[in-house]
A protein has these predicted regions:
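C-terminal "cap" of GNAT-fold acetyltransferases
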Residues: 121, 128-131, 151-173
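Conserved acyl-CoA
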Residues: 106-122
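A short beta-loop-alpha structural element at the N-terminal edge
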Residues: 6-21
Length: 173
């Protein structure tokens, strides 16, 4: 993989089969390795993200290295800490064929540039509190732990994000 050939662009409807495969692979990996696992994923929410240009893919030549979504608000997870001054990264999944190739680092770098262009003060994300390995992984990329909380059961949250004990992480810009 040549990092200079890597691009981040919006996903399209044509990408849906691969997106669903990536989610299935991520869930399988989580379960096999004893990590907290998504209980499924909301295809309607993913379709809305695609339609609203909020889901992205990282590509290198013909290969899709991973997918992720963004938002500019996340009150269901961040509560009163959501002040409208952040870019939120969600559902970041690396294609298992490209693990170990610093795909997340490229996503983080893109997010920093994108958030700065939008004059936002933070990049934020969350992950399961009972996955200290993943928390440490994100800390290794410059994120700091802000808080821990339980997400709501609100219908505006994707199914896989409801009633979770999460650790909130942010990177000041």
């Amino acid at each position: 993989m040549d990092p200079l050939q890597t691009r981040i662009v919006n996903t399209t409807d044509a990408d849906k089969p691969l997106i669903y495969w990536l989610f299935d692979q991520a869930i399988s990996y989580q379960q096999k390795n004893g990590f907290p696992a998504w209980k499924g994923y909301d295809k309607d929410a993913l379709q809305a993200e695609i339609a609203n240009h909020l889901q992205y893919k990282i590509v290198n030549g013909p290969d899709i290295l991973g997918v992720f979504s963004i938002s500019y608000t996340d009150p269901g997870t961040w509560g009163e800490r959501d002040t409208g001054n952040a870019l939120f990264l969600h559902r970041t999944i690396t294609n298992p064929n490209f693990k170990g190739q610093k795909v997340f680092e490229q996503i983080r770098d893109w997010a920093v540039r994108f958030a700065r262009e939008k004059r936002l003060g933070y990049i934020r994300m969350d992950t399961w509190t009972d996955n200290p390995q993943l928390i440490a992984y994100y800390q290794g990329y410059g994120f700091r732990v802000v808080a821990q909380r339980t997400t709501s059961d609100a219908p505006d949250l994707p199914e896989q994000n409801r009633n979770l004990n999460v650790t909130l992480l942010e990177m000041p810009l």
